[in-house]
């Protein structure tokens, strides 16, 4: 069992990106500013700095090698999930399972939402197989953690056996 956790800023291209951070919040820091009071334009606890970013494809190649196959990839990037996936598009066929947190509302300025990510993954060979978690705020569903499986993975056959 070989597992690596890699904490880095990923995007669909290399370069510098503005990164919004709140010194008093333990969540929500992102390249896409949150549409919340914690990251409002008048909040003096929020700082913006330029950080270096890389693509998922380059990160995997540099850390795991050119021929890496990924059994399980989790992405929770505060609205940047689609950008990260686009930056790893050539890797997608080698990934078996994806777990993504996806917003259903405009939670991060210019952040991707569930429908766009779902459409991209379906077009690139993945099936949604399970909603792992629902996140609500004041009774409104705002995000989901969703499990996607590569349509060419043997797991799809097992799932189909259970369903049909």
Question: Which residues does each PLM region occupy?
Answer:
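Phosphate/nucleotide-binding beta-alpha loop and adjacent structural elements of enzyme active sites
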Residues: 1-164
């Amino acid at each position: 069992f070989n597992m690596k956790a890699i904490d880095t800023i990923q995007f669909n291209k290399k370069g510098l990106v503005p990164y919004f951070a709140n010194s008093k919040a333990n969540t929500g820091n992102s390249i896409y500013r949150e549409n919340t009071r914690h990251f409002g334009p008048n909040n003096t606890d929020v700082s913006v700095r330029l950080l270096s970013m890389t693509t998922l494809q380059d990160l995997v190649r540099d850390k795991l090698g050119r021929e890496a196959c990924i059994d399980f990839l989790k992405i929770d990037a505060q609205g940047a999930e689609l950008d990260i996936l686009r930056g790893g598009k050539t890797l997608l066929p080698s990934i078996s399972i994806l777990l993504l947190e996806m917003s259903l509302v405009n939670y991060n300025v210019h952040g991707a939402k569930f429908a766009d990510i779902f459409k991209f993954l379906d077009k690139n060979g993945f099936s949604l197989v399970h909603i792992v978690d629902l996140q609500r705020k004041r009774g409104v569903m705002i995000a989901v953690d969703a499990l996607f499986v590569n349509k060419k993975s043997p797991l799809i056959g097992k799932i189909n056996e259970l369903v049909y």
